[in-house]
Regions:
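TPR alpha-solenoid repeat register
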Residues: 48-49, 82, 116-118, 152
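Alpha-helical segment of the N-proximal tetratricopeptide repeat
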Residues: 9-47, 51, 58
Length: 164
């Protein structure tokens, strides 16, 4: 059971996390990083590490982003976002073969609301490798998960046009 002090720390950490996210979306990455770190010092969470990693990715700091995602997985291996994010960062580093396994791990994560992202990203890998049928299947799976995913929509159209 959570003590009163632990509850207060957790709630403050959640406030810091929310403010960090606002700053990140506003483009103030320095403030976002500082606030994510403060939040993590108070209460380490998978979300905090994942979003700090995402902030690093905005700066092209792929290895730092991956390191934060690995910390997120240590905190909560059921959280799906860091698996997908590691795969996406590996694509940026031209390490597609390594990325595939991370996307597959994202599919297995029980606490994940955006399965369209690993499908879309896996489609990107397959398309880059010239495996167009597999890519198309992944893009369609992304569309099924999220019919509004514009990247998946355009990828499906592009690959279907290549077939004709």
């Amino acid at each position: 059971m959570e003590t009163e002090g632990e509850r207060v720390r957790r709630e403050r950490a959640e406030e810091l996390f929310a403010e960090a996210h606002r700053q990140q979306m506003a483009g103030d990455l320095a403030a976002a990083k500082r606030l994510y770190r403060e939040s993590l010092e108070m209460c380490p969470t998978a979300e905090g590490h994942t979003f700090l990693g995402w902030t690093y990715s905005f700066e092209g700091r792929w290895e730092d982003a991956i390191a934060e995602c690995l910390r997120a997985i240590e905190v909560d291996p059921t959280f799906g976002n860091p698996y997908n994010d590691i795969g996406a960062y590996l694509i940026e580093l031209d390490r597609e073969d390594e990325a595939i396994e991370w996307f597959k791990k994202a599919f297995e994560a029980p606490r994940y609301e955006s399965y369209c992202f690993p499908h879309f990203n896996l489609g990107r890998v397959y398309e880059k490798k010239g495996m167009f049928e597999k890519a198309l299947a992944e893009y369609r799976a992304a569309q099924k998960e999220n019919p509004q995913h514009r990247g998946a929509q355009s990828a499906v159209k592009r690959l279907q046009a290549m077939k004709n």
